[in-house]
């Protein structure tokens, strides 16, 4: 049966990658279809009810700067907001929000249902329509054939998903949802490298059976940070605290005594789990000297009693889970509402992708999210937006776009994945970026909103607010440069009280603000110096740009040097055995990874500077020197 309409972009999957992919393509004015096995689970948080964190918050801000929906959704569905690393430099400060799981999902669904150019259809995808070697649409579980110029796969953990609780296991995409078996089998027939990964989740607990009074309360920040550049704290719903408790020796003893019943330690689970979100079994084994591990007790929402005990993800049998939970202070009488579990699933080697998320061997097919070996809502959302954008560009026969490593954490992530691949679930950290000072949360809009506007991702409302902010920043920076404080200034005494070294000569406000002990707010509070900008985001931008100007300029110089050969293209069909002077090891690694540029090749483990020089000579000799735009 043929569907009655053809689409520019078909997105398979309605999780965090799928919703961003579909809305990105739709914002570009393209006829877009979001195919989901269940409309009621659009934007569902399968694991912890939170958005953001170190590195992750940066990704959310970048998605927002490009017009994405995640930041706006969490502003409307977040029940606790905090800035992490607030005492550290601006490069590593990160926003995190606790979410009301149901409210967040409802907000996402409402956004999608009202999105122009976007249609939603509830059907599982079982097959791809091929036109020669390229994708031309999908086939649903009921045999409906839907034609599309491009297809984006954002299927999460559903491909051959296998859920484990103790020695028992059953097929599932996540708890309560069926797996995608037919599509997984179809994809295994294609020339793609495939492997297995695993992730897990803790048991959920009824708050009415818990004694929160013996735990440490953890409140949000005041004033509250806002995720979206066009958001406002007044949009936030009622705020609630989280709580902190700990495992203890009794907990650890229960786990050690039952490791033989763990599917991970019994060899039943083959997939590798996330390094930075290990199960409680892993923690006890890998950190045997630790007598306690933190558990963050997170409310699931404002209208439910369920709690999420972040830190005790487990796949041990249910009876052991009960013992583990009840050994913890405050949980002695806890009632588990849902058992914890581990899930194994198929993923595809992201080295088979171009940096724009398109398959190297199957034109018009794009991958985003956990199918690429990543973990986390934020990583999925960022990939989804990039895949949806490039699927839209491909549908219009326009050039692809992806950010460089110095432009965005999205660029860092996709370069890591497409160049190096991953053997374990990939998670974003600020430490993965070599140009952290350029890739701050606060300047994500400065870096990306202009580009997003050119690509058709940024609407008039966002563009107007962005330009108004930029005008404020530029005018204030000009005022700071041209306003001088001299030794006879009437407010000299107040200025000297602010600085470590009293003024002996005339200094501009900009020079004063460069001093480490001076803040913008304190300087503006001095009579005759202000007023401060009413927009705190613009004021923060002024302060950061002035205080860190030297460091920022130095990083820009480093980027300029690095870019000289970074964008030199390498032909995808190049046989490195034809390049004289390369070692067999280098040839094997280059033929395996098939890097798109000299920059990507240089970041492959074992590729030496000498090998890069040989490649450049070969390209020049054969007239192959080309650079990306």
From Swiss-Prot:
What keywords sit in the KW lines? Answer: Cytoplasm, FAD, Flavoprotein, NAD, tRNA processing
Q: Which GO terms describe its cellular component?
A: cytosol
SMART domains registered for this protein in UniProt: GIDA_assoc_3
What does the entry list as the binding residues for NAD(+)? 273-287
Where is it mostly found? cytoplasm
Give the domain of life. Bacteria
| Residues the record lists as binding FAD | 13-18
What's an example of a GO molecular-function annotation for this chain? flavin adenine dinucleotide binding
Regarding protein family, the annotation reads: Belongs to the MnmG family.
Q: What does this protein do?
A: NAD-binding protein involved in the addition of a carboxymethylaminomethyl (cmnm) group at the wobble position (U34) of certain tRNAs, forming tRNA-cmnm(5)s(2)U34.
Which HAMAP family does the record associate with it? MnmG_GidA
Q: Quote the subunit structure annotation.
A: Homodimer. Heterotetramer of two MnmE and two MnmG subunits.
Protein name, UniProt field: tRNA uridine 5-carboxymethylaminomethyl modification enzyme MnmG
Q: What gene, per UniProt, encodes this protein?
A: mnmG
């Amino acid at each position: 049966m043929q569907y009655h309409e053809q689409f520019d972009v078909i997105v398979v999957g309605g999780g965090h990658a799928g919703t961003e992919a579909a809305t990105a393509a739709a914002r570009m004015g393209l006829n877009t279809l979001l195919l989901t096995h269940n409309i009621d689970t659009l934007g569902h948080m399968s694991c912890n009810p939170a958005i953001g964190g170190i590195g992750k918050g940066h990704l959310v801000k970048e998605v927002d700067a490009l017009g994405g929906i995640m930041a706006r959704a969490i502003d409307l569905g977040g029940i606790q907001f905090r800035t992490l690393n607030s005492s550290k430099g601006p490069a590593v400060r990160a926003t995190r929000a606790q979410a009301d799981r149901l409210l967040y999902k409802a907000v996402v669904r409402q956004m999608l249902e009202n999105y122009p150019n976007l249609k939603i259809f509830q059907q599982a995808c079982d097959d791809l329509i091929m036109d020669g070697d390229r994708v031309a649409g999908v086939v649903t579980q009921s045999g409906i054939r839907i034609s599309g110029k491009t297809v984006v796969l954002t299927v999460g953990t559903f491909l051959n998903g296998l859920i484990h609780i103790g020695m028992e296991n059953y097929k599932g995409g996540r708890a309560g949802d069926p797996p995608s078996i037919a599509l997984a089998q179809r994809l295994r027939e294609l020339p793609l490298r495939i492997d297995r990964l695993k992730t897990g989740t803790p048991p959920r607990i009824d708050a009415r059976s818990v004694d929160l009074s013996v735990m440490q309360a953890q409140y949000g920040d005041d004033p509250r940070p806002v995720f979206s550049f066009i958001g406002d704290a007044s949009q936030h719903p009622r705020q609630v605290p989280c709580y902190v408790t700990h495992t203890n020796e009794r907990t650890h003893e229960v786990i050690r005594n039952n490791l033989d019943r763990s599917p991970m330690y019994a060899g039943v689970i083959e997939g590798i789990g996330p390094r930075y979100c290990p199960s409680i079994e892993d923690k006890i084994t890998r950190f045997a000297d630790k007598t306690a591990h933190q558990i963050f007790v997170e409310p699931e929402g404002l209208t439910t009693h369920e709690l999420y005990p972040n830190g005790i993800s487990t796949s041990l049998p249910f009876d052991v889970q009960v013992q583990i939970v009840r050994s913890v202070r405050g949980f002695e009488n806890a009632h588990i509402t849902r058992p914890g579990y581990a899930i194994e699933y198929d993923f595809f080697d992201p080295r088979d992708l171009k940096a724009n998320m398109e398959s190297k061997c199957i034109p018009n097919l794009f991958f985003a999210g956990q199918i690429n070996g990543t973990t986390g809502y934020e990583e999925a959302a960022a990939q989804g937006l990039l895949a949806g954008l490039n699927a839209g560009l491909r549908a219009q026969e326009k050039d692809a776009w992806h950010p460089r490593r110095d432009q965005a954490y999205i660029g860092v992530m996709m370069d890591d994945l497409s160049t190096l691949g991953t053997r374990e679930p990939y998670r974003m950290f600020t430490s993965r970026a070599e140009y952290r000072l350029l890739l701050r949360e606060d300047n994500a809009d400065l870096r990306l909103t202009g580009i997003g506007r050119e690509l058709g991702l940024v609407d008039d409302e966002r563009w107007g607010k962005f330009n108004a902010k930029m005008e404020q920043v530029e005018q204030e920076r000009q005022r700071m440069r041209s306003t001088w404080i001299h030794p006879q200034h009437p407010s000299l005494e107040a200025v000297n009280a602010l600085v470590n070294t009293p003024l002996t000569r005339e200094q501009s406000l900009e020079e004063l603000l460069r001093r480490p002990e001076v803040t913008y707010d304190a300087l503006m509070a001095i009579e005759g110096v202000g007023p401060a900008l009413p927009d705190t985001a613009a004021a923060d931008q002024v302060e950061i740009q002035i205080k860190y100007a030297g460091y920022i300029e130095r990083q820009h110089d480093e980027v300029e040097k690095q870019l000289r050969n970074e964008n030199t293209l390498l032909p995808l069909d190049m046989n490195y055995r034809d390049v004289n002077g390369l070692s067999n090891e280098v040839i094997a690694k280059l033929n395996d990874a098939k890097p798109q540029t000299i920059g990507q090749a240089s970041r492959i483990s074992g590729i030496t500077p000498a090998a890069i020089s040989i490649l450049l000579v070969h390209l020049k000799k054969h007239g192959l020197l080309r650079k990306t735009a």
